[in-house]
């Protein structure tokens, strides 16, 4: 069994309204040293696979077909063997 972790973030230059809203709220609460907040999506997928390389290839396909929008998202995949 393997655990694949996918971290999806907005590409540089794409507006992040959620991060901006959080930053403004933190400033309103007195955390005036906060200048920027970035939000990410993290997805853990537990799956069977032949080896780490094959699992990563399959998760890459999942990202391309469903999990990420290549126009606005960058993503990173980490795979680890689990018991």
Curated annotation (Swiss-Prot):
Catalytic activity, as annotated: N(2)-formyl-N(1)-(5-phospho-beta-D-ribosyl)glycinamide + L-glutamine + ATP + H2O = 2-formamido-N(1)-(5-O-phospho-beta-D-ribosyl)acetamidine + L-glutamate + ADP + phosphate + H(+)
SUPFAM superfamilies registered for this protein in UniProt: PurS-like (SSF82697)
Domain of life: Archaea
Matching Pfam families: PurS
GO cellular component, one term: cytoplasm
UniProt subcellular location: Cytoplasm
InterPro entries, alphabetized: PurS, PurS-like_sf
A GO MF term: ATP binding
EC number: 6.3.5.3
Pathway(s) annotated for this protein in UniProt: Purine metabolism; IMP biosynthesis via de novo pathway; 5-amino-1-(5-phospho-D-ribosyl)imidazole from N(2)-formyl-N(1)-(5-phospho-D-ribosyl)glycinamide: step 1/2
Ranges in coiled-coil conformation: none
GO biological process: 'de novo' IMP biosynthetic process
Keywords for the protein's UniProt record, in alphabetical order: ATP-binding, Cytoplasm, Ligase, Nucleotide-binding, Purine biosynthesis
Classification via PANTHER family: PHOSPHORIBOSYLFORMYLGLYCINAMIDINE SYNTHASE SUBUNIT PURS (PTHR34696:SF1)
Task of the protein: Part of the phosphoribosylformylglycinamidine synthase complex involved in the purines biosynthetic pathway. Catalyzes the ATP-dependent conversion of formylglycinamide ribonucleotide (FGAR) and glutamine to yield formylglycinamidine ribonucleotide (FGAM) and glutamate. The FGAM synthase complex is composed of three subunits. PurQ produces an ammonia molecule by converting glutamine to glutamate. PurL transfers the ammonia molecule to FGAR to form FGAM in an ATP-dependent manner.
Family, per entry: Belongs to the PurS family.
Assembly, per entry: Homodimer. Part of the FGAM synthase complex composed of 1 PurL, 1 PurQ and 2 PurS subunits.
HAMAP family: PurS
Protein known as: Phosphoribosylformylglycinamidine synthase subunit PurS
Organism: Methanocaldococcus jannaschii (strain ATCC 43067 / DSM 2661 / JAL-1 / JCM 10045 / NBRC 100440)
Annotated gene: purS
